[in-house]
Amino acid sequence: IMGHMVNAIEQVDEFLNLGANAIEFDIDFDKDGIAQITHHGIPCDCGRKCTKKAIFTEYLDNIRQVTTPDDPKFREQLVLLALDLKLQRISSAKAYRAGEDVAKKLLDHYWRRGNSKARAYILLNIPLVEDYEFIRAFKDTLKNEGYESYNDKVGINFTGNEDLDKIRDVLEILGIHKQVWQADGITSCFARGTERLKEALKKRDTPGYNYIDKVYAWTLVRKSIMRRSLRLGVDGVMSNNPDRVIKVLKEKEFADKFRLATYNDNPWEKFRG
């Protein structure tokens, strides 16, 4: 269960208390591709305040503590951080610079270049395939800085509802054949059909297909849509209301089929139920 748009530091505990075991936050860049703040901006989901924010490096410092065992702020349930990279707001020519900057800030403020025990997995949410240079830069930077081992903690996810074969082609260009999630969804203000979601799930379940390990639906607020997604077999849902998802998961139909992921579950492995 991914808490959606958790952009203020005080919202982290709020969403965890509602039952989320993952959080998504938005990263806003300046025109040069430097990550500045966690901030969504207007418009955003219905019924939500769009303007909450924090300085990105301060947010990382806090979330490091929240995901470090034995830290006073530690919350065991938080196992995944989804960075919603607002690259569509900057020139595609700056995507590489943005990838370098985010990698260095994670190295300095989250992983602390090997001196941090923060353990959450990281999901890089890229809005459009045209911004794939962000991924190349991110991986290049980890390599150049001597921390390629952190690649094991990082997954890729394209969130713009683009053609799945087009996404596969870009992953092929990048040489990525594992640690890939696929999102499908729309703002909670609108309804969305299931055609592309079903296609993504079919690809995930195709033997030998290496470009989708997990599929999640976003942003779900109605229990009926949560149930629909679970019946289709999604691996996760993003919601403004994690507590509603918890209630649905306790229903007789789902209680034996689904459970919340823990740190002992590998987010890059396909679930074979």
From Swiss-Prot:
Name of the protein this chain belongs to = Dermonecrotic toxin SdSicTox-betaIIB1aiii
For molecular function, the Gene Ontology terms on record are:
lyase activity; metal ion binding; phosphoric diester hydrolase activity; toxin activity
Q: Tell me where in or outside the cell this protein is found.
A: Secreted
Q: What cofactors are annotated for this protein? A: Mg(2+)
- Known function: Dermonecrotic toxins cleave the phosphodiester linkage between the phosphate and headgroup of certain phospholipids (sphingolipid and lysolipid substrates), forming an alcohol (often choline) and a cyclic phosphate. This toxin acts on sphingomyelin (SM). It may also act on ceramide phosphoethanolamine (CPE), lysophosphatidylcholine (LPC) and lysophosphatidylethanolamine (LPE), but not on lysophosphatidylserine (LPS), and lysophosphatidylglycerol (LPG). It acts by transphosphatidylation, releasing exclusively cyclic phosphate products as second products.
Q: What is its EC number?
A: 4.6.1.-
- Cofactor: record remark: Binds 1 Mg(2+) ion per subunit.
Q: Which InterPro entries match?
A: PLC-like_Pdiesterase_TIM-brl (IPR017946)
The entry assigns this protein to a family as follows:
Belongs to the arthropod phospholipase D family. Class II subfamily.
Sorted alphabetically, the Gene Ontology BP terms of this entry are: killing of cells of another organism; lipid catabolic process
Top-level EC class as recorded in UniProt: lyase
* Keywords associated with the record: Cytolysis, Dermonecrotic toxin, Disulfide bond, Hemolysis, Lipid degradation, Lipid metabolism, Lyase, Magnesium, Metal-binding, Secreted, Toxin
Which cysteines are disulphide-bonded? 44-50, 46-189
Species source reads Sicarius cf. damarensis (strain GJB-2008)
User: Which N-terminal stretch is annotated as signal sequence?
Assistant: none
The organs and tissues expressing this protein are described as: Expressed by the venom gland.
Q: What is its main location?
A: secreted
Residues where Mg(2+) binds = 24, 26, 84
- Protein's UniProt keywords contain Lipid metabolism: yes
Q: Which residues are the active-site ones? A: 4, 40
Reaction(s) catalysed by this chain's protein: an N-(acyl)-sphingosylphosphocholine = an N-(acyl)-sphingosyl-1,3-cyclic phosphate + choline; an N-(acyl)-sphingosylphosphoethanolamine = an N-(acyl)-sphingosyl-1,3-cyclic phosphate + ethanolamine; a 1-acyl-sn-glycero-3-phosphocholine = a 1-acyl-sn-glycero-2,3-cyclic phosphate + choline; a 1-acyl-sn-glycero-3-phosphoethanolamine = a 1-acyl-sn-glycero-2,3-cyclic phosphate + ethanolamine
Q: What GO terms fall under cellular component here? A: extracellular region
Task: Specify the domain of life of the species encoding this protein.
Answer: Eukaryota
